[in-house]
């Protein structure tokens, strides 16, 4: 089946619906599994600084497999790549259920996620293009954030009831994603027949990195999305320690409710970006990025639940408005230069390197005993300064 058959079809075509459902279930499993596994670490008396280490082994898999997953996504039908990747996630979640070391099981989920990401975003450029691509990204982000909203809450609430039930629910979600992937049309491979020599693949990936980094637009997108997702993941772990200190609440569910507020906000922000920002007006998203850091700083000083909910929702709105146009810009420019799969793989390397760095710094700060509120204040201020610097650089170039 040729790729052109599906390009420029309705945003609600059968293929797009299958992609969105598969993404929802896969992301639901990812987010529920994080909080279920954090509850498992707490129940097994792991130290607090080990919590971000869990996410670090996950993103480490992204970085390790970054040179290869883009070519995998471009060499096979992307729907089948997504199905295989969700199968790996299912295996990882099931292994934690059956008592395998949670860090090992979560690493396997990370390998599946690394393979999944270039395919899930790359397939959008095959199902639609041009002006519809920003809207397709909005649908993908809305689906993802809805899954974050429900998955995070489900993981925390079920873990308060029984950790094993929470872990089993994650495995079921991944199983559902595998089934949904079956209904994605089998599009032609974007770049079949490439060499599978690991040295050549690594060299090709480094060439893709160089190509995207040397282009001003794609470099701008790579830096912006890397900063955003690195900060977003760090904020999730910050909330786990901030809630008992600032609010005096010690259950597993409250941090997930707060994360849900961010998720709701991102859905709103992603929708606004799809309507108000085009590939030609991407710079409109930059003030929102700066305000994210400012609002995080203000949030860190709160001691009441209602203001915390409101500020986190605002952070989400700003985040959705900021990141969706940057994603669309990279996909459109990257598809023309290095292929959509390679472009997303390079993006994953940048984003996960930022996550690894920020989580490492955060884990170190917790380990040496810095209080969580000053960590939050410094985190927000540094993020605002970083996005300001990126905007100044973008305007000059």
From Swiss-Prot:
Gene3D superfamilies (alphabetical): MFS general substrate transporter like domains
Q: How does it sit in the membrane?
A: Multi-pass membrane protein
- Main localization of the protein described in the UniProt heading: membrane
Tagged with keyword Cell membrane: yes
In terms of InterPro entries, this protein maps to:
LysoPLipid__transptr_LplT, MFS, MFS_trans_sf
What are the subcellular locations of this protein? Cell inner membrane
One term of GO molecular function: lysophospholipid:sodium symporter activity
**What job does the chain carry out?**
Catalyzes the facilitated diffusion of 2-acyl-glycero-3-phosphoethanolamine (2-acyl-GPE) into the cell.
PANTHER family attached to this UniProt entry:
MACROLIDE-EFFLUX PROTEIN (PTHR43266), MAJOR FACILITATOR SUPERFAMILY (MFS) PROFILE DOMAIN-CONTAINING PROTEIN (PTHR43266:SF2)
List the keywords (alphabetical). Cell inner membrane, Cell membrane, Lipid transport, Membrane, Transmembrane, Transmembrane helix, Transport
Give the source species. Answer: Shigella dysenteriae serotype 1 (strain Sd197)
Q: Which residues cross the membrane?
A: 18-38, 53-73, 91-111, 145-165, 167-187, 227-247, 257-277, 281-301, 305-325, 344-364, 367-387
Q: Where are the Periplasmic topological domains?
A: 1-17, 74-90, 166, 248-256, 302-304, 365-366
Q: Which sequence ranges are listed under topological domain Cytoplasmic?
A: 39-52, 112-144, 188-226, 278-280, 326-343, 388-397
Task: Kindly list the GO CC terms recorded for this protein.
Answer: plasma membrane
Question: What SUPFAM superfamilies has UniProt attached to this entry?
Answer: MFS general substrate transporter (SSF103473)
Give the matching CDD domains. MFS_MefA_like
Protein name from the UniProt record: Lysophospholipid transporter LplT
On whether Manganese is a keyword of this UniProt record, the answer is no
Family membership: Belongs to the major facilitator superfamily. LplT (TC 2.A.1.42) family.
């Amino acid at each position: 089946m040729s790729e052109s058959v599906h390009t420029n079809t309705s945003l609600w075509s059968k293929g797009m619906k299958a992609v969105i459902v598969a993404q929802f279930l896969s992301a639901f499993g990812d987010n529920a599994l994080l909080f279920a596994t954090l509850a498992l670490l707490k129940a097994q008396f792991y130290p607090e600084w080990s919590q971000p280490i869990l996410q670090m082994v996950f993103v480490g898999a992204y970085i390790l497999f970054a040179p290869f997953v883009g070519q995998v996504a471009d060499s096979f039908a992307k729907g089948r790549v997504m199905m295989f990747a969700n199968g790996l996630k299912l295996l990882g979640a099931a292994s934690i259920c059956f008592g395998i070391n949670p860090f090992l099981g979560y690493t396997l989920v990370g390998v599946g996620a690394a393979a999944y990401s270039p395919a899930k975003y790359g397939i959008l450029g095959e199902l639609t293009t041009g002006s519809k691509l920003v809207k397709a990204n909005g649908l993908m982000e809305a689906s993802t954030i809805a899954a974050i909203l429900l998955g995070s809450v489900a993981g925390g609430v079920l873990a308060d009831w029984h950790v094993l039930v929470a872990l089993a629910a994650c495995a079921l979600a991944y199983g559902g994603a595998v089934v949904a992937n079956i209904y994605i049309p089998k599009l032609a491979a974007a770049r079949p027949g490439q060499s599978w020599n690991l040295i050549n693949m690594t060299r090709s990936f480094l060439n893709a990195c160089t190509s995207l980094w040397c282009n001003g637009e794609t470099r701008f997108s790579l830096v912006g999305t890397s900063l955003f997702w690195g900060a977003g993941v760090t904020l999730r772990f910050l909330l786990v320690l901030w809630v008992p200190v600032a609010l005096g609440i010690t259950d597993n569910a409250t941090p997930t409710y707060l994360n849900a507020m961010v998720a709701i906000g991102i859905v709103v922000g992603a929708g606004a970006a799809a309507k108000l920002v085009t590939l030609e007006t991407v710079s409109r998203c930059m003030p929102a990025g700066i305000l994210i850091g400012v609002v995080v700083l203000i949030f860190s000083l709160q001691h009441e639940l209602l203001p915390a909910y409101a500020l986190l929702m605002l952070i989400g709105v700003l985040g959705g408005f900021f990141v969706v146009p940057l994603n669309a810009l990279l996909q459109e420019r990257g598809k023309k230069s290095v292929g959509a799969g390679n472009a997303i793989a390079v993006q994953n390397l940048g984003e996960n390197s930022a996550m690894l760095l920020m989580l490492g710094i955060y884990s170190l700060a917790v380990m040496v005993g810095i209080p969580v509120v000053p960590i939050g204040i410094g985190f927000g201020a540094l993020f605002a300064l970083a996005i300001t610097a990126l905007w100044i650089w973008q305007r000059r170039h």
